[in-house]
Amino acid sequence: MEKYDYSELGLKAGLEIHQQLDSKEKLFCRCPTLIRDVKESDFEFFRYLRATESEMGEKDRAAVEQTKIRRKYIYKAYDTTCLIENDEEPPRELNKEALDISLGIAKLFNMKPVDQMHVMRKIVVDGSNTSGFQRTAFLASDGFIETSQGLCGIDSLCVEEEAAQKIEEIGDSIIYSLDRLGIPLVEIATAPDIKSPRHAREVAEQIGMFLRSTGKVKRGLGTIRQDVNVSIAEGARVEIKGVQALDLIEDIIRREVERQLNLLFIRQELIERKAFVCEEIYDITGLFVDTKSKVLQKGVKKGAVLAAHLKKFEGLVGKEVQPGRRLGTEFSDRAKTAGVGGIFHTDELPNYGITEKEVKTVRDAIGASAGDAVIMVADEPEKARLAIEAVIQRAKEAMEGIPEETRKALPDGNTAYMRPLPGAARMYPETDVPQIEISQEYFDSIEIPELLTERAKRFVSENGLNQELAEKIAYSKHLPLFEELIETYGKDENVNSTLIARTLVGIVPEIRRNGVETENLTDEHFKGLFVAISNQEIAKEAIQDLLAALAEEPELSTPEAISNLGLSAFDPEEVENFIKKTVREREDFIKEKGPAALGPLMGIVMKEYRGTVDGKILSQMLKKELDSFINQG
């Protein structure tokens, strides 16, 4: 049961899906799209970035805020990256393979391509691009998908280069890895047609299925990201970036709606109280020269303790806007953009070693009355000043309602401030890459891939898989291998489609749960396994042990692993003699049980030959010997 009536609240929501493409080379250079261990980096360099003007002479507001603090950006490079990632060389022509994949995706979403594609520069000064901008190209628009709530529009599809991966922050320095920078990706933006949190998840799942249906997108953590745009009738558009898991989408939207409703309540309360934000910044460093508070002692040593006076704000700074997050947390997020650790406010004091007497002294010093709130920041003078200015600005916005922001998704479903929403000044033309013609003939030549849902149906009808197994293999990363193997063993009595599918999506996960690194298994390992089963060199019961052995020692070939495990081909005469001996030694038991003795006897035989002889063969041989004994008796 949903907490809110989203239709009544006027919820508008849309998604932006960023999906890496599985091309051999990067978008604007010929480097491979390999993700490297940062320890393999063979050199590094650093940059300082600043906001630049667009072709209209304007600076993007988000870029301006992000460059208020001078940060040092350190880049880790590899023998698989080049001067283009370093921004020391102009880009090459756009990757044709990536363009073909992107056009195929556009077709799946019923989109119309542009006649002429122009590459643009999108200003990004968070350090994730060495150049200070990301190259992006608008490719298609005006598409749709069908959902349980009606059609959901697909407004745009852009081809972009992936950003560098943030490794860590050390003080005012941020370290990035260049292995990811420049990997091709598509950005797919829906229309604001999403009607509820559950509908958002449905749309995201369907878009993800369409993308995986191409067989040409990367898989795994970090290869797909969802941004969510949310607003309600009296609220504002907020872009929430970096939703990694589908499970989080519903919570993100629910909690953003809750945040906006609580902020609207706070606004109304402030209006009724006739609240006011004082512009003056108060230097109260001298009041804490002898403080026992360790956090304030550090601030005094750094140089400044500054304060802001918010009239009639008392009790509201500490009001919860999302579970575990308050209006004061929103103030703190803004302050942190200046490089400080956070803020103190009187709704949570005395605390942190700050005494009631010290709070009263501060109130008296700046003229704060009962019912007023005081915000304090302790840090280096310039950082503290920028931080307190940011808090004053956010407090003013609290009186107006909800600011338009870009926020980051947190693991618990809450969100935190990142920067203002970017404006039109963020984009300007890329002059180093020529325009690309997209003719109707070219677009028509792009094949539409079969959807995974359709493949699953085909696996049921043509290959005899049950529905659950068909869906698992269709959505598995092993899908291409499965299709290759069923083509090879289509008429093989020993290797059928069900055995192949169960091995890939049933046995492999079971081995992984036992702590075995199944990522070490290659397609060649699986192919060798099924060759051995087809030739009756091993039994089906040996699959799990053999795959576990190959995963632990991936340098072994399948025949070598079979030999090491003692799973060599069986001698039919030896097996027949063992079965006869087993039957003779249990004559009384067989006379008592008759044909029902087959099960217990099978357990004895399987214990001897499990993994060496196929259970079906053992069962047939034992039944034949048992029937012969009973008939003679």
Curated annotation (Swiss-Prot):
GO cellular component, one term: cytoplasm
UniProt keywords, alphabetically: ATP-binding, Ligase, Nucleotide-binding, Protein biosynthesis
One GO molecular-function entry: glutaminyl-tRNA synthase (glutamine-hydrolyzing) activity
Catalysed reactions, semicolon-separated: L-glutamyl-tRNA(Gln) + L-glutamine + ATP + H2O = L-glutaminyl-tRNA(Gln) + L-glutamate + ADP + phosphate + H(+)
Keyword Cytoplasm set for record: no
Class in the EC hierarchy, top level: ligase
Subunit annotation: Heterodimer of GatD and GatE.
Family to which this protein belongs: Belongs to the GatB/GatE family. GatE subfamily.
NCBIfam families: gatE_arch, PRK04028.1
Cited function: Allows the formation of correctly charged Gln-tRNA(Gln) through the transamidation of misacylated Glu-tRNA(Gln) in organisms which lack glutaminyl-tRNA synthetase. The reaction takes place in the presence of glutamine and ATP through an activated gamma-phospho-Glu-tRNA(Gln). The GatDE system is specific for glutamate and does not act on aspartate.
Record-given protein name: Glutamyl-tRNA(Gln) amidotransferase subunit E
Originating species: Methanosarcina barkeri (strain Fusaro / DSM 804)
